[in-house]
């Protein structure tokens, strides 16, 4: 399994924020962080600004349906603070609502949030510890043989430095990004097809580029298939439908 260290952090957009996650491989635990506003930082809560986790109650919060952010803020809806949570099928839709002034903040994984920051002026990530959590690839119960195969293959890829290179290609230094693309191996693929379900709306984990789904997770799965002699089939679906 792939364990991903998660870090929720605040992203600012005219008084609104994102929670986000930090990628890591191994057995790291996620550290969640808080949020803040560039233009209204330090203002008291109750005026629409978000400068810390303490400011979340009573705010209008956007999340992607079924994500960690969705789970995180659900308790705020029933604590009597008047918090309203808007759930979107795509993180990008929540971001647009934020830019249009319909939300006070958006809660989303860090690396996708960083991509939104790069694409949209006025966004800023503010860090504050909030929660810890593990992420992993998921295989259906009853398929222990595949679980063992994938786990062993991931260990081999880690030991060989392949996982580190894949991560550096997307999230490394300016000198590293784009310099370590995973190259599909020319191997016999006689062991069937590995079908991977994902929501391709989370750059750099998984996203569309020139009509093809790519990203860290997809490169890892391609490397796994190369090792196992399998074809890779990627199915893009709503995040909330990946695990029914």
Question: Where are the regions that the model predicts?
Answer:
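Hydrophobic core
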Residues: 12-13, 17-21
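Sec-dependent signal peptide cleavage junction
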Residues: 21-38
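A ligand-binding cleft/hinge motif common to bilobed small-molecule-binding domains
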Residues: 71-77, 92, 96-131, 241-244
């Amino acid at each position: 399994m792939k364990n991903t260290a998660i870090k929720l952090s605040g992203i600012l957009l005219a008084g609104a924020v994102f929670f986000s996650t930090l990628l890591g491989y191994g057995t790291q635990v996620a550290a969640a962080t808080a949020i803040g506003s560039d233009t209204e930082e330090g203002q008291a809560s109750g005026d629409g600004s978000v400068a810390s986790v303490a400011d979340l109650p009573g705010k209008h919060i956007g999340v992607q349906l079924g994500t960690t952010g969705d789970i995180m803020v659900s308790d705020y809806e029933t604590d009597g603070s008047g918090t309203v949570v808007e759930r979107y099928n795509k993180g990008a839709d929540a971001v647009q609502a934020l830019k249009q002034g319909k939300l006070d903040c958006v809660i989303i994984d860090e690396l996708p949030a960083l991509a939104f920051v790069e694409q949209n002026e006025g966004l800023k990530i503010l860090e504050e510890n909030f929660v810890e959590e593990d992420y992993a690839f998921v295989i259906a119960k009853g398929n222990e043989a595949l679980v063992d195969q994938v786990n062993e293959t991931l260990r081999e890829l880690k030991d060989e430095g392949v996982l580190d290179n894949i991560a550096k290609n997307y999230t490394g230094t300016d000198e590293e990004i784009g310099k370590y693309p995973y190259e599909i191996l020319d191997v016999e693929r006689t062991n069937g097809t590995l079908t991977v379900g994902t929501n391709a709306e989370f750059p750099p984990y998984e996203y569309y580029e020139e009509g093809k789904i790519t990203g860290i997770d997809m490169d890892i799965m391609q490397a796994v298939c190369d090792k196992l002699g399998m074809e890779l089939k990627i199915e893009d679906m709503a995040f909330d439908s990946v695990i029914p």
